[in-house]
């Protein structure tokens, strides 16, 4: 799993939580450029993506691209999970993508990951190489 989060402490806490669940974290990317590079290098089976990242693109746009190019599913994490406009945008670009609210609830995180592991890639996404 790849974590894309620009808040260092939150990323480290999430990494520790995932590792305690037995999930291997292949890297932490604090920005979009690092997220793309790590995805190309590590080919993660899942990405935890912060919605709001520094740069010309946000987490939603890059998640869509990662899915199209690598077929990797994305779980979004945001402090704005109650923002209807944001949720509509996410679900329009990536139908069915889970959105978790910060701070993360461990049991909800675990259930979401288990659910994604059992789903086929969204239609229109290329299969992973």
Where are these regions (language model features)?
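Short amphipathic alpha-helix used as the core "switch/output" element in two-component signaling
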Residues: 60-69, 88-92
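Active-site beta3 strand of CheY-like receiver
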Residues: 42-49, 53
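Short hydrophobic/Thr-rich beta-strand motif most characteristic of the beta2 strand and flanking loop
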Residues: 22-30, 38
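C-terminal output helix
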Residues: 101-116, 121-126
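Acidic catalytic/metal-coordinating carboxylates
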Residues: 31, 57-61
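Hydrophobic/aromatic residues positioned on beta-strands within the core alpha/beta folds
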Residues: 77-79
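Conserved acidic carboxylate
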Residues: 5
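Charged docking surfaces used in two-component/phosphorelay signaling
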Residues: 12-20
